[in-house]
From Swiss-Prot:
GO cellular component: plasma membrane
Name this protein carries in UniProt: Frizzled-2
Location of the region described as Disordered in the Swiss-Prot/TrEMBL record: 138-175
Disruption phenotype: Displaced anterior nerve ring and neuronal cell migration defects including irregular localization of canal-associated neurons (CAN), hermaphrodite-specific neurons (HSN), anterior lateral microtubule neurons (ALM), and the right (but not the left) Q neuroblast (QR) and its descendants. Axon growth and guidance defects whereby some HSN, male CP neurons and CAN extend ectopic axons or branches, and furthermore some HSN irregularly route towards the ventral midline of the body.
Cytoplasmic side: 258-268, 334-354, 420-449, 519-578
Compartmental location: Cell membrane
UniProt motif (Lys-Thr-X-X-X-Trp motif, mediates interaction with the PDZ domain of Dvl family members) ranges: 522-527
Family, per entry: Belongs to the G-protein coupled receptor Fz/Smo family.
InterPro entries for this protein: Frizzled/SFRP, Frizzled/Smoothened_7TM, Frizzled_dom, Frizzled_dom_sf, GPCR_2-like_7TM
Length: 578
């Protein structure tokens, strides 16, 4: 008897707790739903979301539709669906009225249909309470004051048939959510081929943004096929950019320490090293700042129609301008070798054109950069996060990247071959006339050095050009396979990752080649003297006068002048060749 009474009290207490439970209101934190006329909501919502973070991810997929402005109360309707109104004195969440849903559907469905989308099943209107039934059912609903209270029968019948067609294709696993996940079957019929923006791309409001021939479409911030490779890409970028920065800095500082040692035709190597140093800095900024901060605009990649942020522009300027400048200086280097070997120009004669070399070396890439900015061709890379040219637009890549690099490469290699052939003929001539002289050995050594340097530079440059040609041929096919229902599906995950890794490596490894040129015992001596002079430059003069003993009869002879020069003592840090 006592046990029965205890069970009875336990059941009564449980029922009381159940009926006395009220929903808990919480402040709205979803950015899209702030400042829309109410600020309190309750969870879980009708979609089963337990937290606002979950609901926010789904409702923000409709943001492009809100930006289009097809319906003035669309934001209110979406927010009341995903973050229903919560009132402390009302036990149920307040959903939007069916009339509001129908009005939103009637005004926004035509725009969605224009791009091959249907009104999503998750926003079905038939399950929502009607404004006219609030008094009879007691189910309160939300709607702006100007919402039509009656529907046209023909319009209602049309929407009902449309939803029945949607239910025919409805998956039992649950409705797909968001514009990017709506069933993309062409409304005109399955037999008609039509290209529309769908995953893995993002629908955007701007008609200037397009992927292939599909407008209002953009690449996602991150390539969805490489979700597990972001750390690999970042670590790969860090390794090559940091090592390139170190080696290019070493080369350029060596040139500054002993400028007179490096004359034309080899001096352009150090301009090339400086350019590669700046390219490496651009990659390092991307690595330390992050992918999203550099190349992304919310959930999508920055496109050509966007106003690129300051960091994105800085990364573009460092990687594109100085990358193209390095290619121009490569052509100038090959030209100076031709002038030296084929035309027998002296270093002084070549140096007289130094100003012209600098004008071409810096103005030509500057003109290219200005044209890129004028045509708004800067965009982000969804794989590496680098702001460059042609990451999402093949036409811009072809005009501003592939064509200039191909021209610079062909001209540079042509000059290089001409100079190399002339050096070879000079070497053979010297060997025939003076086989015992050391000059032939020095020419052979110089040819070997030039040959190794040329291979170290031309191979990465050729790889970049080949990769760009591959992208020109295959990226458009992949885009078409994702956008068009009648195209055979293609995967690009592994190949796009390999392409990005090759481009990053080749753009940075060019800085290694300049380090090869200065690797010698003379360079070590120059650094040793420079380091020693840093500590002694303030305390010791560069020259120390010597006591010269001479006879009066020697003052008028030429031997006196030569003898006095030999008794002057030069300290470290002053080059032997003045």
């Amino acid at each position: 008897m006592l046990l029965r009474i205890s069970v009875l009290f336990l059941l009564l207490g449980s029922c009381g707790a159940l009926f006395g439970k009220r929903q808990k209101c919480e402040q709205i934190t979803i950015p899209l739903c702030k400042g829309i006329g109410y600020n309190m909501t309750s969870f879980p919502n009708s979609y089963g979301h337990e937290k606002q973070e979950e609901a926010g991810l789904e409702v923000h997929q409709f943001y492009p539709l809100v930006e289009v402005g097809c319906f003035q109360h669309l934001k209110f309707f979406l927010c009341t669906m995903y973050t229903p109104i919560c009132q402390e004195n009302y036990d149920k969440p307040i959903l939007p009225c069916m009339e509001l849903c129908v009005e939103a559907r009637s005004k926004c469905s035509p725009i969605m249909a224009k791009y091959g989308f249907r009104w999503p099943e998750t926003l079905s209107c038939e399950a929502l309470p009607k404004m006219s039934d609030q008094m009879s059912t007691g189910n309160i609903c939300a709607a702006p004051p100007d919402t039509p209270k009656k529907q046209h029968k023909g319009h209602h019948h049309k929407n009902q048939n449309q939803n029945q067609n949607q239910n025919h294709n409805y998956s039992p696993d649950g409705p797909e959510v968001g514009i990017s996940k709506i069933d993309n079957e062409v409304i005109a019929g399955p037999s008609e081929c039509q290209c529309t923006c769908n995953q893995p791309f993002q629908f955007v409001a701007s008609e200037k943004s397009k992927v292939g021939n599909v407008t209002n479409c953009a690449y996602s911030c991150h390539s969805p096929a490489l979700a597990e490779s972001h750390s690999l890409v970042s670590n790969w970028m860090a390794f090559w950019s940091i090592t390139c920065c170190v080696l290019a800095s070493f080369t350029f500082l060596t040139f500054l320490i002993e400028t007179d040692r490096f004359q034309y035709p080899e001096r352009p190597i150090f301009m090339l090293a400086f350019c590669q140093l700046m390219v490496a800095v651009g990659f390092m900024i991307r690595y330390f700042v992050g992918h999203e901060e550099i190349a992304c605009d919310s959930m999508r990649i920055k496109g050509a129609d966007d106003n690129s942020g300051s960091l994105c522009f800085v990364v573009f300027l460092l990687t594109y301008f100085f990358g193209m400048a390095a290619s121009v200086w490569w052509v100038i280097l090959s030209l100076t070798w031709v002038l030296s070997a084929a035309s027998k120009w002296s270093p002084e004669a070549i140096s007289s054109f130094s100003f012209h070399f600098h004008v071409v070396g810096w103005c030509l890439p500057a003109i290219q950069t200005v044209l890129v900015i004028v045509f708004n061709a800067i965009d982000g890379d969804p794989i590496t996060g680098i702001c460059y040219v042609g990451n999402t637009d093949l036409q811009f890549q072809r005009i501003f990247v592939l064509f200039p690099l191909l021209v610079y490469f062909i001209v540079g290699v042509l000059f290089l071959v001409i100079g190399f052939c002339n050096l070879w003929s000079i070497r053979n001539e010297v060997q025939k006339q003076h086989p015992s002289l050391e000059s032939a050995h020095k020419i052979t050594q110089l040819m070997s050095k030039i040959g190794i340097f040329s291979l170290l530079y031309t191979i990465p440059s050729l790889l970049i050009i080949c990769v760009l040609f591959y992208e020109q041929n295959h990226r458009s096919l992949w885009e078409q396979s994702q956008l068009c229902s009648c195209s055979p599906k293609q995967t690009i995950g592994d190949s796009s990752l390999i392409i990005s890794l090759i481009k990053t490596c080749c753009m940075c490894i060019l800085g290694w080649t300049s380090g090869f040129w200065v690797c010698s015992t003379k360079t070590l001596s120059s650094w040793k003297n420079a380091i020693c002079c840093l500590g002694s430059s303030r305390s010791l003069p560069k020259y120390q006068p010597a006591d010269i003993l001479y006879a009066k009869s020697d003052m008028s002879s030429s031997q006196f002048y030569n003898t006095s020069l030999r008794h002057n003592h030069l300290y470290g840090g002053i080059p032997d060749k003045l």
